[in-house]
């Protein structure tokens, strides 16, 4: 099973590139983006992933404007052997220059959602620490992720109108990850799976001359499973980005978070993040949400278009809904990203706070799987 990439000296195992190093059914390789206006007036998300042992390639595009509906396109197909084929029906991703420039195209389709967008990097790529989570003796997540901050140009069309996207006001994050994590239909057979939960925060923020980033995975008592904070230079143009990686990145000694929730929900009304450097100096960043995006619009916990679920040789679909009217405690609605204003007392920024909290979480007073804040 050879493909074009086998002509390059990039192999990490004796197998061809199409053969993952693990036989775990949940192996995946994902490309993901967000984009948002610097005034919080809109947000869009993009995702595509291949699941080699499920033989599936799926994708999604979703957009919401302030005060409007969230519009979604979903696509799924049998995975191509050729890994450079990053297309699902009317949707495709074109890597124009690796680690610098990417084009995302969604041609006209029955969902009424389409786009032609180009992402241009403003930072080098930033590798997060390896993320490994366990359920009993089983490793249920083992992934590498890197992020890159940039700007967007292009156009988005949806059933309620058209958005011109320009790099003078549209920021965004590219997120590449690969490894193993739970996807697709629930597994059957064997002993019943012990109940588990998840607490996750992800906060990429853009400031005048730098970015900050914080990642958290917590256990049910608030114990730290993953903690990472990063500060890195932000460049004026793509041409200024020094290379694949930037030696000026600063890794924090640790990070802390405090989230205040809207009563009766698990949706943040405000949050604070502490970045603690190796000299013990703490930078506290306050976050104010201004726009909500439901991550089910990209397939996360979606009951019909969940990631890694077999839909057929090639299927596409779409939907529109008002994110202000969904039940915030339904399992499919708990995972969100919010566009947030950020300030640290001296500087102001803009960015995103991603959040998912399912199951008991003592620091916030959650005692059940889907109870809301008091």
Set out the residue ranges of the language-model regions.
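Structured soluble/peripheral alpha/beta segments that form catalytic or ligand/cofactor-binding pockets
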Residues: 1-374
């Amino acid at each position: 099973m050879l493909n074009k990439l086998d002509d390059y000296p990039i192999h990490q195992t004796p197998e061809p590139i199409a053969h993952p190093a693990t036989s775990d059914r949940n192996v995946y390789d994902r490309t993901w983006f967000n984009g948002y206006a610097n005034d919080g007036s809109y947000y869009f998300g993009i995702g595509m992933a291949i699941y080699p042992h499920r033989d599936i390639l799926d994708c999604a595009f979703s957009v919401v404007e302030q005060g409007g509906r969230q519009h979604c396109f979903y696509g799924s197909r049998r995975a191509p052997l050729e890994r450079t084929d990053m297309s699902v029906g009317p949707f495709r991703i074109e890597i124009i220059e690796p680690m610098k420039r990417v084009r995302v195209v969604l041609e006209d389709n029955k969902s009424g959602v389409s786009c032609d967008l180009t992402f241009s990097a403003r930072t080098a790529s930033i590798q997060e620490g390896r993320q490994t989570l366990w359920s009993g003796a089983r490793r249920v997540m083992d992934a590498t992720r890197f992020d890159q901050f940039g700007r967007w140009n292009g156009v988005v069309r949806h059933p309620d109108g058209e958005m011109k996207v320009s790099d003078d006001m549209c920021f965004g994050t590219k997120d590449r990850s690969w490894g193993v994590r739970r996807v697709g239909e629930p597994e059957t057979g064997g002993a019943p799976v012990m109940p588990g939960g998840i607490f996750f925060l992800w906060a990429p923020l853009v400031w005048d001359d730098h970015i900050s980033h914080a990642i958290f995975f917590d256990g049910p008592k608030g114990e730290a499973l993953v903690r990472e904070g990063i500060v890195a230079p932000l460049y004026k143009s793509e041409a200024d980005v020094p290379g694949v990686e930037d030696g000026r990145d600063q890794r924090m000694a640790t990070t802390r978070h405090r989230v205040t929730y809207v009563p009766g929900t698990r949706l943040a009304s405000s949050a604070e993040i502490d970045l603690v450097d190796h000299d013990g100096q703490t930078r506290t960043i306050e976050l104010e949400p201004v726009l909500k995006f439901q991550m089910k619009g990209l397939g996360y916990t979606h009951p019909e278009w969940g990631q890694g679920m077999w839909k057929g040789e090639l299927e596409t679909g779409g939907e529109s809904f008002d994110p202000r009217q969904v039940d915030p405690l339904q399992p499919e609605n708990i995972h969100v990203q919010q566009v947030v204003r950020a300030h640290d007392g001296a500087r102001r920024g803009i960015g995103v706070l991603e959040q998912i909290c399912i199951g008991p979480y003592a620091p916030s007073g959650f005692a059940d799987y889907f109870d809301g804040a008091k």
